Amino acid sequence: MLANIKKTVLATAIIATATTGFASVATAAERSELTVHPKEFTTFVRNFNPFLGATNLHTTTDFMYEPLVVFNEMQGNTPVFRLAENYEIADDLLSVVFDLRKGVKWSDGETFNADDVIFSFNLVKEKPELDQSGINSWVSSVEKLNDYQVKFNIKEANSNAPYEIVKVPVVPEHVWKTIKDPSTFTNENPVGSGPFTEIDTFTAQLYIQCANPNYWDADNLDVDCLRVPQIANNDQFLGKVVNGEMDWTSSFIPDIDRTYAAASPNHQYWYPPAGTQAFVVNFKHPDPAKNEALTNVDFRRAFSMALDRQTIIDIAFYGGGTVNDFASGLGYAFKTWSDEETHKKFQGYNTYNVEGAKELLSKAGFKDVNNDGFVDTPSGKSFELLIQSPNGWTDFNNTVQLAVEQLAEVGIKAKARTPDFSVYNQAMLEATYDVAYTNYFHGADPHLYWNSAYNSELQSGDGMPRFAMHFYKNDKLDGLLNSFYKTADKNEQLEIAHGIQQIIAADQVTIPVMSGAYMYQYNTTRFTGWWNEENPKGRPNIWAGIPERLLHVLDLKPVK
């Protein structure tokens, strides 16, 4: 059910916890606390291990562990240098040299240098379960040229290597070299390089993360602390954000003008275009009937034709999105990369057509054998698809519920499931799910989406994200994905993109629904400097995985 929001009087929660042993942070009554909501948690577990993205707290990367470089996606991946001051990629695209920033200290006062970078990458190499981005498939070795210069040797020519390299967290060698098992280490008292490293308060319902006393860029930091309240679901979030308790959020708000913006002139939002959202099916399903259905391309096409995408956008997202009728999932934001012949050839399979879906199912042998109103497989097996979305993700939950109803119209039996995110995610990693609704990364070009969503090299190994866990494999597709950045020539990349598009579209690997928006809300009551339509410096979200949030927080200043 969509949340029914009542407007309440604006209130500001004041945290009066005194700080001790941390002279660089003002007392709680005086300091500026930026209240953020990067992710839903049913309870907080004190885990600040930057290599454990599935279980850590989502203010760990960027804010505790600063990257070498932030590539600003909205500005064409323009590099903004952080722990590094420069990089240079070799003409043959087989190595990258990073010049590190001198004068940087870890939060405990120890000096940051090349040894920390070398250690961090070797740690991921020795412990592949810590490799969240697949960097081990790109980097063969790391060399120390001097105390502030590091060379990365690349396995194959890759013009995008710097972008991939900076995704790996850099941790202090002097701390982590004594950790026996980094894959289970929760890092409760972190030593970091970013702006907020000090855990001032921690409970299951609230933690406050305060300024690094040795932050190298402290002159540009005006926020004293991040305040992170525990929020379990969208309904709980809506109560807080409408009440004026939150400063920086990136969650779904139904009917945002009426429920949020109307509550206060200080309640602002900006929703720049974002990436693809789609239904993913499990090609490795252990159940014979479900496997027979899900691995049949005409069944996937009929599933796709059953979806009234515009209705889903209008109801589940209150109009916040664009229909994605590309069988490849490419989306109109990347239309300049599209082979329009391929797009049009398969567009009909990604357009709402109830009768067409029924005809395609019948042609493929899916008929109602037992007269229960739903189709059975061509071999006569009955099945019911369980379609999952994470609990509390109201827009996703409503999307799935609408899809279940629309699938029933063409004779496909399905039921919605809303497990906690960790359960949802694990089911995808272990191939124990039927169908899942997910969003995807959105980059400066389509490769980030396509590679993370379809490269079979990302379907195995601990720490891999969920996006390619449909377990569809195509060697030619993998080859094209892996060759995209072996050239820096845009015309050659366009030709490769057309080949990628053709394969994914022809096989209808996933069922794209829409191109979403970067949901972002901000409150001007307590802070100024927010990114918005008039100040579009970068992707504005507070989510982990958006490194631009580091640059964003440095632009914020408390209201005097």
Predicted regions and their residues:
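Gram-negative bacterial Sec-dependent N-terminal signal peptides
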Residues: M1-T27
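Extracytoplasmic/periplasmic ligand-capture domains
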Residues: A3, F71-M74, E88, V97, ...
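Cleaved targeting-peptide boundary
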Residues: A26-L34
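Intrinsic-disorder/low-complexity, polar/charged segments enriched in Ser/Thr/Lys/Arg/Asp/Glu/Gln
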Residues: E33, L93-V97, Q149-K151, C225
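N-terminal lobe/hinge region of extracytoplasmic solute-binding protein
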Residues: H37-D91, N122, V191
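Short, glycine-/polar-rich solvent-exposed loops and beta-turns at beta-strand/coil boundaries
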Residues: V80, S133-N136, G320
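Surface-exposed binding/hinge segments that line
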Residues: E88, D99, S133-T178
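Active-site-proximal polar cores
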Residues: V513
